[in-house]
Amino acid sequence: MPETTQDTCASAKDSPFFIKNLLNSDSKPSKPKPILAPTKAGLDGSFSLSQVGEINFPRFELPTQRFALPAYLERASAWWYPYTLSASAHLHRTEAAQKARDSSPTTGTDRDSPELVLKSDPDAKDDEDDNKSGDEIVLEEGDTEDGKKEGGIDDWKKSDDGADKKPCRKKKTRTVFSRSQVFQLESTFDMKRYLSSSERAGLAASLHLTETQVKIWFQNRRNKWKRQLAAELEAANLSHAAAQRIVRVPILYHENSASESTNTAGNVPVSQPLLTFPHPVYYSHPIVTSVPLLRPV
C-alpha cells in the first residue's frame, strides 16, 4: 500500500498537467515562427521589422542606400507596402518598375510583377491616392491654371486682331481740282465724251494731273451726264402726257326755227349771235368741256 501511494505521487509530479508544470510551460513560451519569413531578405534592404508581442510590424525606416538598389530588390521590397514610400520615392519606384517590366519577359509570377499586385488590390490604390503629397496636387492645379491663362490670353489677342481687321477699310482719296482744270476738263468733255489713251495722256500732262485722275473724272462726268439726260427725258414724257389730256370742244349755235322766221316781219333783220368764232376753241380743263357755249336767244 505505501509503494502504491509513492508511485502515484511520482507519476503525478511527472505529469505535464500538474500545476507547476503548467505554470512553467506558460512562463517559457516557445519561440513563434516569423510571419514574414519568406520576404525578410527583401525587406531588410528597405526597412527593418519590429516585434510587438507575437506579431511582426514593419518600421518605416528608409536607409540611405534605398534608391541605389537594383530593380529586382526595388520590386521585391515594395510590392506589398506601396504606401510606405513618400511621393518622390514612389515615383522613383514606378519608373524603375516600368524599366524592369520593359526589360523582363512577358511571362512571370505575381511576385515578379508588382504592377499586377497593385492592380488587383483596390485598397492599395486608395492608400496610394490618399498618401500623395500636396506638392503634386498644387503643381497639377498650377499647370492647368497656367494653361487656361495662356489660352485666355491667346483668345484675347485673336479677338483683338479680328476687331482691328474688321474696321480696317481703305479710304478713297478725293482729288480737288482747281477752276482752270475743271474748265479745261468740261470744255474737253463737251467736245468729246470718250478720250483715247493718247488724248488722255496729253490732257493729263497739260493739266499737271495723272492719267488715272483724268480717267476717273471723265467716268464721273459721264455718269452725271447720263443722269441729266434721264431727268430731261422724264420731264418730256410728263409734258407729253399732260398734252394728251387736252380735249377739243366745238362751239354750238342755235339756228332760228322756220316758225319764228315766218312770224317776223320781212323788214326786221334776224338777230345774230353775240359771239361768233370762225374756228373751234380748245379747253384743257375737263369741267369746261362738259358745258357748251350757248348763244343767247
From Swiss-Prot:
One GO biological process term: otolith development
DNA-binding region: 170-229
Tissue: Expressed in the ear placode and vesicle and in cells forming the vestibulo-acoustic ganglion. Also expressed in the lateral line.
Region described as Disordered: spans on this chain: 24-43, 96-172
Location in or out of the cell: Nucleus
Gene3D superfamilies in the record: Homeodomain-like
Record carries keyword DNA-binding: yes
Keywords, alphabetical: Developmental protein, Differentiation, DNA-binding, Homeobox, Neurogenesis, Nucleus, Transcription, Transcription regulation
One Pfam family per UniProt: Homeodomain
Primary location: nucleus
Induction statement: Regulated by fgf3 and fgf8 in otic vesicle.
Entry's Gene Ontology molecular function annotations: DNA-binding transcription factor activity, RNA polymerase II-specific; RNA polymerase II transcription regulatory region sequence-specific DNA binding
Biased composition (Basic and acidic residues): 109-123, 145-166
Top-level taxonomic group: Eukaryota
GO CC field: nucleus
Function text: Transcription factor involved in specification of neuronal cell types and which is required for inner ear and hypothalamus development. Binds to the 5'-CAAGTG-3' core sequence.
Sequence similarity: Belongs to the HMX homeobox family.
Name of this chain's protein: Homeobox protein HMX3
Organism: Danio rerio (Zebrafish)
Gene: hmx3
